[in-house]
Amino acid sequence: MALVPLFVTVVSRPVRAAFGWGWLYGTVYFLVLLRWLDFTFRTYSDIPWPLTWGPMLALAGYCGLYVGAVAGAVSWLAGPSIGRALAVSPLLWVGAEWIRGHLFGGFPWGLLGYSQYLSLPVIQIAELGGVYAVSLVIVAANAALAGCLVLSRRSALNGVVLAGVLLVGTLAFGAWRLSAPAPTGEIRIAIMQPSIEQPLKFVPGHAAETVGIYLALTRGAGAERPQLIVWPETALPTPLRRDPELARMLESLSAAVDAALLVGSIDVEGKAPPKLRNSAFLLTERGIIGRYDKIRLVPFGEFVPLSGLIGFVRSWAQFIAELEPGSRASVFSGPPAPFAVVICYEGIFPELVRELVKGGARLIVNMTNDAWFGRTAGPWQHLAMYPFRAVEHRVAVVRAANTGVSAFILPSGHIGRHTALFERTVLTEPVPLRAGETIYSRFGDWLAYLALGVSGASLALRAWRRAA
């Protein structure tokens, strides 16, 4: 109930002070959440400590603005009625989360709903309204408790009853959905976790050893008869389409294990200067039969925004690349079944996964390299978002990570077999295929749009009444 003190504070403060308290609250929250960024910059950049805190402070301060905006809006609406302000606060919060996930390219990391990723009965409502539905329930519960401290007994009771009905309805729906029979169709998939330290991934002298690790893991997986074997993001040390010998080796490997291979590689196209893309290739004994180029690139990781003005930052860190985004959310037709790939943090964008599901994907594969995060909370925070993609569309998610956390996630959002960080291993499991369409698959972020509409109308009505 971490939002209760914030709501109690801001309903009795002027708007400007409330915004300040909200911004401070949000900034501290994101500083704690994003502290793995300090590790990344300390380890892989030339920025001296303690200046490595700079990027983390900047991002946390930016994300904190959205909490400040919600706090300021609640304060303003509380002028004529604290009860109504608290009633609207869940919608204000959801609207702010949606805007943060879209403005300036979007950064939907750490949405409040993700905190419940292990609470399966709670997160089942994501199939109705996405992760935003879970955020709404959490904020509603906090607002009701805050009302107990600042409202009259009758008004507070009304708020508690409404929030209680919402929470009980959420849990009842969750219990009902968790008792539903599982989909019948399934395929057998193996995921590789090679646990190759980031500094070694693209060192020329280590290339042969890297390939050898993958070959050994894949041959070992072949004994369990998978139909698809998944390697992580940028697994290959050389661009696949520029290395015919490596391509032939993978074709032979696919034939030997009798399974399709899904491998991550940098793709190089053109000359002087070539275009580089972060790609996933599907191979069989017949060669490359499909390719997906990453669409959502990581700012200051895979490209530099406003590079004409601040392109100099590339010299600060070895992890800053200049990649070209893909242009199409493509779905692999198989083998073994229609599936789609999201690379690295693409899967934290609900609308992209929805587009892939609408395109016919019956399975979602996430290929990632979270070695940049080291042994911090970063890889676990990244993992926590994928149960929601599973529930939103009732689709299984298969996750192959270079250093972890690799996992099989069921359509219920349950995280099944998974690895530890920096563990070299192979996991093989039968994976169910998506069989139907959810409300979220069909209508997308309708709840977020409703939240934005009601929030905007509430603020406009307050402004009109104040001016009248």
Annotated model-derived regions:
Residues R177-L447:
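Soluble catalytic domains of enzymes that build or remodel membrane lipids, polysaccharides, and related
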